[in-house]
Amino acid sequence: MSRSEALFAQAQKHIPGGVNSPVRAFKSVGGTPLFFKHAEGAYVIDEDDKRYVDYVGSWGPMILGHGHPEVLDAVRNQLQHGLSYGAPTAMETEMADLVCSIVPSMEMVRMVSSGTEATMSAIRLARGYTGRDAIIKFEGCYHGHSDSLLVKAGSGLLTQGVPSSAGVPADFAKHTLTLPFNDIAAVEKTLAEVGQTVACIIVEPVAGNMNCVPPAPGFLEGLREQCDKHGVVLIFDEVMTGFRVSLGGAQGYYGITPDLSTFGKIVGGGMPVGCFGGKREIMGCIAPLGPVYQAGTLSGNPLAMAAGLTTLKLISRPGFHDELTAFTSRMLDGLQQRADAAGVPFVTTQAGAMFGLYFSGADDIVTFDDVMASDAERFKRFFHLMLEGGVYLAPSAFEAGFTSIAHGDKELQITLDAAERAFAKLK
């Protein structure tokens, strides 16, 4: 029995499902989840001392690679001064100044402790600002596990939301409308009928929880136009895309300005951090300035601020994102070439240093239906074949992949060699 198998058996005694986040259980790909004990650069090392080129990156935060020395030094330095104060610090102000300078739409920002907390707070703020209750989200987009967002609508565009998780009251979920991603006509129709009741539209500008689906031409522009027309707050959930697809996130990459934005992952440098912010007029509704309450014991935690500040400064250097995007493109091109040579139907998608892999014969992946039509069973086999070859991908056909600046030519060759062997077995 491997160490991971033994640890998983032990974990299941007192941890539901043996994991603290469902995707880690390998339910989507089968087998025993790997337990990691160390990570360095572009690699993760499991409890049996096997090394893997890592394309999960803790689900996005590790854009510098694991254990970057300057980030570790910043955290060590802060450790000498205490773990948490529950009071304002200079680093919080420095972080706010830096985030607002990087992302022009962020006129004010509030730090929180997770991406879920950021999206939950942004929606509450939009409701408080507009005095409206309904929200619009998109099929296949995940915005954390708060009650109002664990909803998927029925087949009609205006079908009231029904919970997709037990424990979410139907009366609460009914305020959430779910529309098809990349379908601006559905948005126009919905807002024409019920726009006066809608507080906000929240969207992943690149849908990262149905693998990686970039916005169709005109989709984000259409959202901005429709929100302006109907007085609806436009929220970009940039928990995944922020500081990754470009320094200024997806809004910088695509040139669209939201009213509010949420961030997580990279902004904490690997620590549990999120933030939300946007227009000063809207942010002025947050307590203690306004009537919308939001608070958190560990918000602005100094250890997290030290890691996040250092990370944001390092990725702000000229050329950083160009280099990272170029590596990602080379890797995806290499995978596509090898799949084509093996005669395996395969499509890749990319937004900066974020990517998607689909076993599909489609020309492109644009909609939720395109994603669901891909071959998840073939992905399962591919995932395990890549593991055998020393490459760790997201253990789900519906999760995005991430590269880091620590990935280089050596890691690229390991990846492409493993993929060539895998595709040959998938014919």
UniProtKB/Swiss-Prot annotation:
GO cellular component, alphabetical, reads: cytoplasm
Q: Which UniProt keywords apply?
A: Cytoplasm, Isomerase, Porphyrin biosynthesis, Pyridoxal phosphate
Q: Which reaction does it catalyse?
A: (S)-4-amino-5-oxopentanoate = 5-aminolevulinate
Give the pathway listed in the UniProt entry for this protein: Porphyrin-containing compound metabolism; protoporphyrin-IX biosynthesis; 5-aminolevulinate from L-glutamyl-tRNA(Glu): step 2/2
For the modification N6-(pyridoxal phosphate)lysine, the affected residues are K265
Q: What's the chief localization of this chain?
A: cytoplasm
Where in or outside the cell is it found?
Cytoplasm
List the EC numbers from the record: 5.4.3.8
Q: Which cofactor does it need?
A: pyridoxal 5'-phosphate
PROSITE patterns recorded: AA_TRANSFER_CLASS_3 (PS00600)
Kindly state the subunit structure of this protein: Homodimer.
Family of the protein in this entry: Belongs to the class-III pyridoxal-phosphate-dependent aminotransferase family. HemL subfamily.
Name of this chain's protein = Glutamate-1-semialdehyde 2,1-aminomutase
Q: Which organism is it from?
A: Pseudomonas entomophila (strain L48)
Originating gene: hemL
